Curated annotation (Swiss-Prot):
Family: Belongs to the RimM family.
Domain PRC barrel: 97-169
Name under which the protein is recorded: Ribosome maturation factor RimM
Entry note about domains: The PRC barrel domain binds ribosomal protein uS19.
Cited InterPro entries: PRC_barrel-like_sf, PRC_RimM, RimM, RimM_N, RimM_N_sf, Transl_B-barrel_sf
Length: 169
């Protein structure tokens, strides 16, 4: 398949003897995860996405479990542990002009208005109040609040972000 996929969940350990698996959403909420139509799976150590044939998805409190079709015991289910679940990028909702998918920020180079480099975005921390870009340059790590006040410009096609931020903040 030549289309781009976005990871929305990761499969964890087996849950029951009948082959159910723990499912860890990478989306903001379990409801968001469950709202996507067709899911695809990428087994560990492969770059191949295959359409996922799920039998059922069970939500209990804040946990999610998945039962894959034709997987009827824990031994068979173990080969799916640490597999990724994805959806085609085209399946994601269209964003407003001032919105971005956080995954698109990963790998962006970050410089300030003085052209000082903060390296590249390697992670995003969700604090509740706002998100924070985790940028790495050589052996240094910089935490930059991802708020309009500090983001001067973003060019996601060129993977570049300009911030109004200094090393000593």
């Amino acid at each position: 398949m030549s289309q781009d996929f976005v990871e929305i969940a990761k499969i964890g350990a087996t849950y029951k003897l009948n082959g159910e698996l723990n499912l860890y959403p990478l989306a903001n909420s379990i409801e968001t995860l469950l709202s996507y139509g067709d899911w695809y799976i990428q087994l560990p150590a492969t770059n191949v996405w295959q359409q996922l044939k799920g039998e059922s998805v069970l939500k209990r409190a804040d946990k999610v479990y998945i039962k894959l079709a034709n997987i009827n015991n824990a031994d068979t289910a173990k080969k799916y542990v640490n597999a990724l679940i994805g959806v085609p990028k085209r399946a994601l909702p269209q964003l407003a002009e001032d919105e971005v998918y956080f995954k698109d920020l990963i790998g962006c180079s970050v410089k300030n208005i003085n052209n000082d480099s903060f390296g590249v975005v390697v992670d995003i921390i969700e604090t509740g109040a706002n998100e924070v870009l985790v940028c790495k340059e050589d052996n240094s790590e910089y935490l930059i609040p991802y708020v309009k006040q500090y983001i001067v410009s973003e060019d996601l096609n060129s993977k570049k972000i300009v911030v109004d931020w200094e090393y000593d903040y």
